[in-house]
Amino acid sequence: MTPGELRRLYLIVRVFLSYGLDELIPQMRLTLPLRVGRRLLFWMPNRHADKPLGERLRLALQELGPVWIKFGQMMSTRRDLFPPQIADQLTLLQDRVAPFDGALARKHIELAMGGPLETWFDDFDQQALASASIAQVHTARLKTTGQEVVLKVIRPDIRPIIKADVRLMYRLAAWVPKLMPDGRRLRPREVVREYEKTLLDELNLLREAANAIQLRRNFDGSPMLYVPEVYSDYCRESVLVMERIYGIPVSDIPTLEKQGTNMKLLAERGVQVFFTQVFRDSFFHADMHPGNIFVSYEHPEDPCYIGIDCGIVGSLNKDDKRYLAENFIAFFNRDYRKVAELHVDSGWVPRDTNVEDFEFAIRTVCEPIFEKPLSEISFGNVLLNLFNTARRFNMEVQPQLVLLQKTLLYVEGLGRQLYPQLDLWTTAKPFLESWMRDQVGIPAVIRALKEKAPFWAEKLPELPELFYDSLQQHKLLQQSVDKLTNQMQAQRVRQGQSRYLFGVGATLLVSGTILLSGDVEVFPAWLIAAGIVSWVIGWKRTT
């Protein structure tokens, strides 16, 4: 380790110990060297013993800085790995840091654009509009049209910080299986690898621009969701330029109510937007926390969401969507056998899983949920319970489903914050059932024919030739089979003859040997010689 890494590791250890996070390690895992080491660090006592463990973990991550804050935010979505009291605290982590100097932002933008800022923009505001751990946002106007825009620029110093902290995370991850009872199940190195990929994706703003363009296209003209326009000609890997929007933060309930917003419709549209993204488009915004969602000032009686920050998106393939929709419908129909079979058929759990045992486990965990009124049942917790039960039956972690679960929890929490009486199932069920009918009915057949029509139109002129080639190949195959059959029959005949000759040879050898013990001298020698000849001929037949 470099001196810089050693200093950073010392700081991490000091912060962890000052918040008493050594309590995460069970006493039975504290070996003698660890106990001695902890006592030697007596000047690092737990200074927050009055606070619960989950809160202490959150405060420690906040003190360690933006990379660790984002790591905690990601881990808050992995409720299969942590008890609720810790996961709930991690969701409270705020990705807010002081902005860096606007003059430095201007210099970084000019470096990325390859010229003076005034070439493309007017009225650039060096005071940041918003600031987070990875990037910050400034306002300006396009020189050509006067359109108000925002420029999102990556922090110049963030890459080396991320690389250094991620390297330390890998080193610490190697110790987790040794120190924690569930260490192997947590798969710490995979968790760090997933986090590293997420961070690197967020550092490439061209990826975010492409995501925003796709999402905007999917909801073009929709009254439910508006996505600001991206000006891709001005975008670079470290700079994103998009339309500036004005809206009410979705978490600002008093302002929404004062505006006269139809809160019931707004909450229901949040659910509809989510299921439309997942099942219609197979492309969903996976970072839909309140800081990224606004509500348009226009038409409060017919409210429209505004979505920003498309750095993290998820997608489901056709099979995942179908299995997920069928799982939801089967669960709310309390058909646990169907739920178990769907998990096996989808490959989410191994094929050799005992379906009866799996069904019983799902029933045991999920049946108590129906003690509540249907309107109070949490979709996100349903999904969480299903996945946690499935993991006991060796379900592999599905990254796309983890993202989906996280987003669903966001959407559900947001919807009930806006309108506490929101019945998520009543809102979602018609959509899911309609989507399922569309997938298996006549429209699905017609759609499949349309999709395949260009392929068959291209192949149609070739069909006679393909048919002739197929007949020729069948003929050649039949000839090969006949030849092989004849060879096998000839081989069986030779094997039969060989066995006969071996038997005759053995008889002659035994007879000659017996007669040699008598007074006859020449005749037995001939018998033995004949036996040897029979053996040689039989051996030749076999080869």
From Swiss-Prot:
Residues that coordinate or bind ATP: 129-137, 152
Superkingdom assignment: Bacteria
Transmembrane segments annotated in the record for this chain: 498-518, 519-539
Pathway: Cofactor biosynthesis; ubiquinone biosynthesis [regulation]
Domain Protein kinase: 123-501
Localization per record: Cell inner membrane
GO molecular function, one term: protein kinase activity
Membrane topology: Multi-pass membrane protein
The enzyme's E.C. designation: 2.7.-.-
Keywords per UniProt: ATP-binding, Cell inner membrane, Cell membrane, Kinase, Membrane, Nucleotide-binding, Transferase, Transmembrane, Transmembrane helix, Ubiquinone biosynthesis
Keyword flag Oxidoreductase: no
SUPFAM superfamilies tied to this protein: Protein kinase-like (PK-like)
One Pfam family named in its UniProt record: ABC1
InterPro entries linked: ABC1_dom, Kinase-like_dom_sf, UbiB, UbiB_bact, UbiB_kinase
Predominant location: membrane
GO biological process, one term: ubiquinone biosynthetic process
This protein's GO CC annotations: plasma membrane
List of catalytic residues: 287
Family under the similarity heading: Belongs to the ABC1 family. UbiB subfamily.
Alphabetical list of PANTHER family matching this protein: CHAPERONE-ACTIVITY OF BC1 COMPLEX CABC1 -RELATED, PROTEIN ACTIVITY OF BC1 COMPLEX KINASE 7, CHLOROPLASTIC
Function recorded in the entry: Is probably a protein kinase regulator of UbiI activity which is involved in aerobic coenzyme Q (ubiquinone) biosynthesis.
Protein name, UniProt field: Probable protein kinase UbiB
Annotated source species: Serratia proteamaculans (strain 568)
Gene name of the record: ubiB
